[in-house]
Amino acid sequence: MSRYLLRDVQAVLRGVRKVAESSLKLETEKVSLRLGDFRSQPSLRSVPASLTSRSQAFSLQEIAARAGVVLRGVQQQFRNVTGVNAAPVVAFDNGSVLYSERIHSQSSQKQAPTTVPTGSVSNSPQPEGKANEAAERAKQFMNPPVAPMDPVDKNEFVAMPEMGRSNGNGENKQAADFMKNQGDTDMDSQYAPDSSKNTKSVPTKEIVAEDGSMSIEDIKKATQVTPGVAVKNEGV
């Protein structure tokens, strides 16, 4: 908490510095006007210039001393309230320069955030930029690059969406085209035995009794297939 209070006091001191600078400018203008009036008088034109410069310098030093007293009073009040010695912060030079800005910039550099990336061997703090590099490495580890596919697999992968493409009615386009080209042709006909080959047909009507019943032996004979011989059943 004292750190934040110190920053507030520094802000107050910066305001006091601006007021002191404004007062210094006003007093300088007043001194310049007085010197102008003093030089304009005929009876006092013989006054040496060194005397007037000493008078102006005395006025500036007096203003600086008064401003320094004010700042030292603020410093003492700050020490009484917080118990922190703020002497390096409240440094006044010739009534116009406060060193609080320089010290504040140094303290901000010392308080820069530091992080230690995951997987680091040493526990020494690393700059914040190293954390971004660690995040990139973790991202690449979680999402490794995929190996390129072979040309054959790539062609098959490209052809796969065509299989599932719909013609707008929820039907498979390739299947619909295939059935359209086939017409009313029974798909089982392409597996029918070739008549040019030596085939033996076993008509089922010869083994069916008059009452339509079939014995087990007849069923075995009807369904028995000789190797190399295709059997074609005919309906009753």
UniProtKB/Swiss-Prot annotation:
Residues 102-135, 165-209 are annotated as: Disordered. GO terms for cellular component: mitochondrion. Mitochondrial heat soluble protein acting as a molecular shield in water-deficient condition. Disulfide bonds: none annotated. The keyword Transit peptide applies. The MAHS motif is conserved in tardigrade MAHS proteins and forms a predicted amphipathic helix. This is Mitochondrial-abundant heat soluble protein. Improves osmotic tolerance of human cells. Residues 1-73 form a transit peptide. It comes from Ramazzottius varieornatus (Water bear). Residues 105-126, 192-202 have a biased composition (Polar residues). Keywords: Mitochondrion, Stress response, Transit peptide. A motif (MAHS motif) lies at residues 126-143. The keyword Disulfide bond does not apply. Its main location: mitochondrion. It is found in: Mitochondrion.
